Regions:
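Aromatic- and glycine-rich peptidoglycan recognition patches
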Residues: 123-195
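Generic structural signal for residues positioned in beta-strands
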Residues: 62-63, 107, 126, 153
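...with weaker cross-activation on analogous glycine-rich loops/strands in unrelated enzymes
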Residues: 79-136
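Intrinsic-disorder/low-complexity loop/linker signature
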Residues: 34, 114-115, 175
Length: 195
């Protein structure tokens, strides 16, 4: 894995403040868009609200990679399955892109201490990503909360079928799979994949 450092360029305070305004309660999520907008006075930025992104049932991985929400929600019973796929397996499954070949739809993974913390999609010369349970924003590559880390890499966008199949394989090999196998297999079929 070859990562690139996020350019600092006066973004340290913005990134720290973005961490401070992130919440997880429904009230926090509803107010998040306004908080981001208000930050532009003390910390000028180009972050733009795109959509709510499925609210509190979705996250950056579901948004950027389009893994069916039903599968993610099913594995949320044991968050380690999703967390381990995201932090340990995802970057190894995708093809790294040289900076000169980065284009629309490619995936941006953000890292902290070598662990994947966030994922977004390239749209034009910006990134579109869902910040936890908060809305989807379009932003510069450096305009993300500090907790997402200081390094990133751009990878080729996988097909939805490919990445979903890899997620299913990972979940089925996980030690906790036995605890969710029936409900997970129902979700796999419901989402149009083979059980």
């Amino acid at each position: 894995m070859s990562t690139t450092r996020i350019p600092v360029g006066g973004r340290t305070e913005l990134r720290q403040r973005l961490d401070e305004i992130s919440g997880s309660s429904p009230e926090d999520i509803a107010l998040h868009q306004g908080r981001v907008k208000t930050l532009s006075a003390p910390c000028p930025h180009s972050i733009k609200y795109i959509e709510d992104g499925g609210g509190d049932r979705s996250d950056c991985m579901v948004y950027a990679l389009e893994i069916p929400l039903d599968l993610v929600v099913t594995t949320a019973i044991f968050p380690n399955i999703l967390h381990e796929f995201f932090t340990l397996a995802l970057s190894r499954l995708l093809e790294q892109m040289p900076a000169s070949e980065v284009s629309e739809g490619h995936v941006v993974l953000y890292f902290k201490d070598g662990e994947t913390k966030h994922v977004g999609r390239i749209q034009g010369n910006r990134v579109s990503s869902k910040w936890g349970k908060n809305p989807v924003y379009k932003h510069d590559i450096s305009e993300v909360p500090a907790s997402y880390g200081d390094e990133y890499e751009v990878l080729k966008q996988p097909s939805v079928r490919y990445i979903t199949n890899k997620f299913i394989e990972f979940a089925r090999r996980h030690p906790r799979y036995v605890d969710i196998s029936d409900i997970f297999d129902e979700s796999v079929i419901k989402c149009g994949y083979k059980s």
